[in-house]
Every structure is written in structure tokens, then in C-alpha cells.
């Protein structure tokens, strides 16, 4: 008897079935499931396949597209005879099976393959139609009902897999309310490749040869992805960057959210040079929302192709079977902008020996049926249509060049990318539609700058932190024109998270023109990297930034043409408002001198110098002159007092700031002392224990005497 393991394959019979074998209407697959425990007879019997007079326990795998696979040779269990099982079969058992002449044994393949499901009729290429599964607007693309799925019997070792419906791709991408934020995610991935030798990232517009539609290209010449990393990139939650100190990625979700926010489909080409004696590889992956919706898939499946360099040619890496390979090729060609495998491989010729090339197509449209991305307004830029684009701001940007980034970053990718990173690695280029993006530091747009060091307070005394943030605050150079430009650019690990964060929403003109820059690595960015997680640390930072802006504004606003801030009135009637601009809302500028009771007295005493009740002659003139001098002296004293009070208030503010800083330093020092004290106490206890052990050891020694 042949010792090789074979699995029966059932074939479709003609409508005229032999006696005892009913006809079937479609191709069938034996759906096998077994436990990993060989001792469990019930589970073994449930996964048996008859081979001759023996039964083979088989384990079902899952193929690339979510279906059942054929038998995996590595998972074939031991051959079990009926005698070993102690099972007696009734007479005529198995009579309903097809005759042996119609059953052909095939060798079990070592990898997963597809279920033999009849393929649906090929729909027209989605890029040529006016709709994608019913809608091309991003915010409405999730409004569809897929086929009701009831096939939940697939399991692994008795545990059910959590299934991910294709609609999750859309709902996951809604975290990006702002489309330009999705570009930033892809640029982050390219910038992280600097460690692998990347020197550029290119963002451009391409035209689809199939439908003539426009597509997005993001390409870098970094280290690329091998087949394993490509699969992690297409999966959810895999992130090797979360453990790296200088990278911002941590959720393993940015590629999926960003690409699906910009378009319905994305195809990725990546070439990875060989390392540690391994051959070079190149991979193609297709993540297509259009494909998943149009074919009624209930799980996210990703067609992929892998190649390996075997000099001088590239050879296919067949992970399961040739049939699977052909199925992946057909699917990618049908649902991608390319018409043949040769066209697919030509994309690797454009990236030379390494790198990653991402093409996003079936771009989303707005309510008017136009692309959400505007490629025509500027041939060297990619801009947004809709509410983020304000013609008034565009006109003001040409008048006030130092405020240009504040006025245009919401709709212009070139403007946003120029301030996206606090520092650009030397020699690294960001190329947007053929022209390099010029890196811009917002500090260059500022005047009368001040530098303040902010140290966050530690959450617990047991944790000592050396984190701090240097805040550079000042007026924008266009502030003298009283443009409403204000806010802080807050970076995290070199990446802009909050552009021009407006934290002081004062009425009137208070706070105008004040901008700042800081890098806060002690706060955690949110899921979309367009904000921070609301924590106590962030609340303290926000409160401190508000205080900085108020103090800077009240101290320096008169230098750019605004009125000096008024003070609270004291018990003596003087105007002595607090220096906080909250107490002053766009009013008269100078210090007002109240009219004291003495003025009213003299005015009533001398209503008319020539009247009957007035004082005439030399005495009257002398009194008038003395009165005038007293008034001038009083006014001068009031001004001096007011200036002195203003200086006192400013000194009070400075003193409060110093007290707060000293308090934070004291708390930090106390925490450090407590930690050191505990460590010293532990060390002392350890020493005492060691001494006691030494004494016990010495005492336990029995002296030996020679007789």
C-alpha cells in the first residue's frame, strides 16, 4: 500500500446519478474541523477522511481570502484504523458516496488554497463607473448593507476568530476629519525610513490608464517591506515603531486609516533588499474597498503577490498553490488600475533597487460630484475644496506673507507639509508634484520673541522625569496690521500635532498676533495625530500656555499699536485693573484720571471769576495760579502712582510665576529625595541582612581541634 497521504476530492456528477448516489447541484467541499488533541475521540471522528480502510484526521486552515483551505500536510494527524477507534460501522455505511472510479485522490498541499467556489461574473472596472458600490462620497460610503452572513462555524482549536467586516475600513478611516491629516500619516512612514537610508518621499498625481481618473502617488526610496512586513502593513494593530524612541507611530493603524480616507482603493508595491544572507524580495498588495463591497465579502481579504530575487531573474513565491497565485493575479488585475502582470511588475522598475510605491485610486468626491482633492488650483500643490478653503484667507496670505502658513495650511498640502516637522533630516527631500517642499520654521515669522522653559509636574513622586518643553512665544511680524493670527504650534517627537492651537478665546482683540512653538514629548497624541489625549498633563500644559499668552499680551500689546491694558480700580478710585486681558475688552487706551472732590469744590467756589461772588484782584489771580499748580502736581503724582502700581502688578505676576516654578522644582526635588531615601533605606536593610547572615555563618562554624 502506498504510504503517501491522499485526500479525496469530490467532483460534480452529471444529472443522471447512479443508484444510491443523489445528484448535486454545485461543487462541494468537505468542511473539516478537528481538535489539536489526538486523545479526543469525538473531535477526531468529526474530522476524519476515509483513505482506503483507514481514516485520517485533518485540520482545516484558512486561505488568503478568508475561505477554507485544502489540507495542510503539517496538520495531518496520525492514521487511525477503525479497530483502534473501536468503532463498528453498520452494513452499507458510505453507500451514498460516489463510486471509487469517480473519486480521484490528490496529494495534500503544504499551504492554504481557496474553496472551489464558482466565481461571480466580473463587474466592470470600478474606476470607469460613476459610482463605487453606490457612492463616491467618503462620509456616505459606509451606508450600505452587505449580505447577511451566517457562516460562523470557522474556528481554530475550538476558539472562534473575530471577523472584520469591510465596512470597518470606512468607519476606521473616519477618525481623519481632515483629509490633509491623512497625508501626514503617509509622510510619517516615509520619514521613518530615513533610518533605512531614505533620501526622499514623492507625492504626485497620476492618471488611471483604465478609466482616465486621477490617482495619488506616494513613493519613497527607503528599505521597503519584505512579504512579512507587507502583511503586517495591511493588517490591523501591527506596529514595530511603538518601541522606538524617535518615531511617532504606535497603533499600527495609520496606513489603513489614511489611505481609506483619501480613496476607496490602494495598491502597494514594495521592494526590499536582501539582508543577513536573504534574497531580495518584492511584494504587491491590494486593499480595495471597492472589491470587497462589489463582491459581497464579509471579511477583509487582501490579494497579494510575492517575488524573490534569484539571479538574474525574479521568481514567484508561491505560498499555497499555483491556482491561488493565478487567482490573486486575476483579482489584482481586475480591481486595480493595471491590465496585466507585466504592467504590475513595471512599477518596480520605477523605484530601482528598493523602496515603496503607494497608489491610491477611486479618490473620494464631494457633494457636488467633484474630487475632494483639487489638483487644478495650483499645478505644484494639492489643495482641498469645501469648507477648509476660504478665498478671503487666500487673498490675505498674499498681503501678509508672514501669516501665510496660518491662513493657508488648512487647504494647501504644500503649506501644511512645510511646517509639519520641526526638523528635517539633513539631505531628506519632500517632493510635491515635482517641486521640493521648502521647510519652514514658524519662529522665523515671529518678532519680540521670548523663551520660556516649561517642566511638567510628575504624576507620582516615584517617577522622576527629565522632560521639559521650551516655549518660544512672540508676535507674528504682521501683528501691527492687527490680523487675527494666534495660537501655538505643538509638536510631538518632531511632528506637528496641533497647528496654531487657539487656547485663549478672548472677545475683542485680546491675544491677537501672539503665536508660539513648542515640542511636548510628554503628552500622548490622539489616534489621528491631529490632537492630544485629554489627560491631566495636557490640561496643565494648556493652562500654563494660556497664562503665558495673557502675560505676554498684556505686557507687550502696546508695542504693536494696541491700547495698554487697564487696571482694576482701587479703593482710592484709581484705575488698577488686573493685568489679565480678560478684564479689558477693546476700550479706550490711556489711563483715565477720575475727577476728585476737590475739583468739584473749586469749580463750585469759582463759577465765574468776574461774578459778584468771585474773588477779584491780585488775590484772586494768585489763588488761581496756585490752584493750577496744585492740579498739575496732583496729576503728575497720580501718573507716578499709577505707573508704580503697574510695576508692582507686573512684579507680582513675575513673583507668582517664580513661586510656581519654585513650587514645581520643590515638589520634584521632594520626590527625588523620597525616592533616594527609600533606596537608601532599602540598601541599609540589605546591608543589615547581609551582616546578620555573615554572623550566623560565622557562628555556625564548628572549630576543629587536633588531638
UniProtKB/Swiss-Prot annotation:
GO terms for biological process: defense response; DNA repair; gene silencing by siRNA-directed DNA methylation; positive regulation of defense response to oomycetes; regulation of DNA repair; regulation of gene silencing by regulatory ncRNA. Residues 1-11, 575-587 have a biased composition (Basic and acidic residues). One of its GO terms (cellular component) is nucleoplasm. Residues 1-22, 568-619 are annotated as: Disordered. It comes from the Eukaryota. A motif (Nuclear localization signal) lies at residues 633-640. It is found in: Nucleus. Keywords: ATP-binding, Chromatin regulator, Coiled coil, DNA damage, DNA repair, DNA-binding, Endonuclease, Hydrolase, Kinase, Nuclease, Nucleotide-binding, Nucleus, Plant defense, RNA-binding, RNA-mediated gene silencing, Transferase. Residues 590-613 have a biased composition (Polar residues). It holds the Pfam family HATPase_c_3. It is an enzyme of class 3 (hydrolase). GO terms for molecular function: ATP binding; ATP hydrolysis activity; DNA binding; endonuclease activity; kinase activity; RNA binding. Disruption phenotype: The double mutant atmorc4 atmorc7 exhibits a pathogen response phenotype with abnormal up-regulation of several genes involved in plant defense. Residues 620-701 form a coiled coil. InterPro entries: HATPase_C_sf, MORC_ATPase, Morc_S5. Its EC number is 3.6.-.-. Homodimer and heterodimer. Component of an RNA-directed DNA methylation (RdDM) complex. Forms homomeric complexes. Exhibits ATPase activity. Binds DNA/RNA in a non-specific manner and exhibits endonuclease activity. Probably involved in DNA repair. Involved in RNA-directed DNA methylation (RdDM) as a component of the RdDM machinery and required for gene silencing. May also be involved in the regulation of chromatin architecture to maintain gene silencing. Together with MORC4, acts to suppress a wide set of non-methylated protein-coding genes, especially involved in pathogen response. Positive regulators of defense against the oomycete Hyaloperonospora arabidopsidis (Hpa). Belongs to the MORC ATPase protein family. This is Protein MICRORCHIDIA 7. The gene is MORC7.
Amino acid at each position: 500500500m502506498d504510504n503517501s497521504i491522499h485526500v479525496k476530492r469530490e467532483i460534480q456528477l452529471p444529472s443522471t446519478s447512479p443508484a444510491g448516489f443523489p445528484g448535486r447541484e454545485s461543487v462541494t467541499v468537505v468542511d473539516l474541523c478537528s481538535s489539536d488533541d489526538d486523545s479526543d475521540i469525538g473531535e477526531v471522528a468529526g474530522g476524519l477522511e476515509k483513505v482506503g480502510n483507514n481514516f485520517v484526521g485533518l485540520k482545516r486552515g484558512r486561505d488568503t481570502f478568508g475561505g477554507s483551505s485544502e489540507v495542510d500536510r503539517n496538520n495531518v494527524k496520525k492514521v487511525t484504523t477503525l479497530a483502534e477507534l473501536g468503532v463498528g460501522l453498520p452494513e452499507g455505511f458510505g453507500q451514498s458516496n460516489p463510486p471509487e472510479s469517480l473519486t480521484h485522490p490528490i496529494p495534500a498541499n503544504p499551504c492554504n488554497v481557496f474553496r472551489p467556489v464558482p466565481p461571480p461574473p466580473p463587474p466592470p472596472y470600478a474606476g470607469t463607473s460613476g459610482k463605487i458600490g453606490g457612492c463616491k462620497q467618503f462620509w456616505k460610503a459606509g451606508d450600505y448593507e452587505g449580505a447577511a452572513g451566517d457562516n460562523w462555524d470557522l474556528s481554530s482549536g475550538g476558539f472562534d476568530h473575530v471577523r472584520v467586516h469591510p465596512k470597518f475600513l470606512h468607519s476606521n478611516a473616519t477618525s481623519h476629519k481632515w483629509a490633509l491629516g491623512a497625508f501626514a500619516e503617509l509622510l510619517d512612514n516615509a520619514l521613518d525610513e530615513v533610518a533605512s537610508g531614505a533620501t526622499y518621499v514623492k507625492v504626485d498625481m497620476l492618471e488611471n490608464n483604465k478609466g482616465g481618473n486621477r490617482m495619488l502617488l506616494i513613493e519613497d526610496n527607503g528599505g521597503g517591506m519584505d512579504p512579512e512586513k507587507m502583511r503586517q502593513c495591511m493588517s490591523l494593530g501591527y506596529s514595530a515603531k511603538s518601541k522606538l524612541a524617535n518615531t511617532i507611530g504606535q497603533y499600527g493603524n495609520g496606513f489603513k486609516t489614511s489611505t481609506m480616507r483619501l480613496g476607496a482603493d490602494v495598491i502597494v508595491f514594495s521592494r526590499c533588499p536582501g539582508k543577513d544572507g536573504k534574497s531580495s524580495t518584492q511584494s504587491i498588495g491590494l486593499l480595495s474597498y471597492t472589491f470587497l463591497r462589489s463582491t459581497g465579502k464579509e471579511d477583509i481579504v487582501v490579494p497579494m503577490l510575492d517575488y524573490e530575487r534569484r539571479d538574474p531573474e525574479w521568481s514567484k513565491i508561491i505560498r499555497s498553490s499555483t491556482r491561488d497565485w493565478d487567482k490573486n493575479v486575476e483579482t489584482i488585475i481586475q480591481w486595480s488600475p493595471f491590465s496585466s502582470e507585466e504592467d504590475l511588475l513595471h512599477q518596480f522598475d520605477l523605484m530601482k533597487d528598493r523602496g515603496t510605491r503607494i497608489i491610491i485610486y477611486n479618490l473620494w468626491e464631494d457633494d457636488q460630484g467633484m474630487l475632494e482633492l483639487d489638483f487644478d488650483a495650483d499645478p505644484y500643490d494639492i489643495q482641498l475644496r469645501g469648507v477648509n478653503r476660504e478665498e478671503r484667507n487666500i487673498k490675505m496670505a498674499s498681503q501678509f506673507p508672514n501669516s501665510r502658513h496660518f491662513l493657508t495650511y488648512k487647504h494647501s498640502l504644500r503649506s501644511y507639509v512645510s511646517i509639519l516637522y520641526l526638523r528635517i533630516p539633513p539631505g531628506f527631500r519632500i517632493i510635491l508634484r515635482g517641486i521640493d517642499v521648502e521647510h519652514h520654521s514658524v519662529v522665523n515669522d515671529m518678532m519680540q520673541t521670548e523663551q520660556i522653559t516649561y517642566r511638567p509636574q510628575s504624576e507620582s513622586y516615584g517617577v522622576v522625569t527629565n522632560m521639559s518643553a521650551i516655549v518660544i512665544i512672540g508676535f507674528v511680524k504682521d501683528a501691527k496690521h492687527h490680523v487675527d493670527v494666534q495660537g501655538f504650534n505643538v509638536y510631538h517627537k518632531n511632528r506637528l500635532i496641533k497647528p496654531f492651537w487657539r487656547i485663549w478665546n478672548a472677545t475683542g482683540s485680546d491675544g491677537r498676533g501672539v503665536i508660539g512653538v513648542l515640542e511636548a514629548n510628554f503628552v500622548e497624541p490622539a489616534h489621528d495625530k491631529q490632537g492630544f489625549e485629554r489627560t491631566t498633563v495636557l490640561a496643565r500644559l494648556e493652562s500654563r500656555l494660556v497664562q503665558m499668552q495673557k502675560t505676554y499680551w498684556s505686557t507687550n500689546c502696546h508695542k504693536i499699536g494696541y491700547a495698554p491694558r487697564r487696571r482694576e480700580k482701587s479703593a482710592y478710585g484709581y484705575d488698577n485693573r488686573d493685568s489679565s486681558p480678560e478684564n479689558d475688552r477693546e476700550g479706550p487706551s490711556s489711563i483715565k484720571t477720575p475727577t476728585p472732590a476737590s475739583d468739584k469744590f473749586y469749580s463750585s467756589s469759582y463759577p465765574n471769576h468776574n461774578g459778584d461772588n468771585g474773588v477779584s484782584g491780585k488775590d484772586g489771580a494768585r489763588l488761581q495760579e496756585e490752584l493750577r499748580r496744585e492740579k498739575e502736581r496732583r496729576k503728575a503724582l497720580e501718573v507716578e502712582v499709577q505707573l508704580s502700581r503697574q510695576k508692582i502688578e507686573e512684579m507680582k505676576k513675575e513673583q507668582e510665576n517664580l513661586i510656581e516654578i519654585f513650587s514645581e522644582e520643590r515638589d520634584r526635588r521632594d520626590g527625588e529625595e523620597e525616592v533616594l531615601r527609600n533606596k537608601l533605606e532599602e540598601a541599609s536593610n540589605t546591608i543589615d541582612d547581609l551582616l546578620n547572615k555573615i554572623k550566623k555563618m560565622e557562628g555556625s562554624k564548628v572549630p576543629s581541634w587536633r588531638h
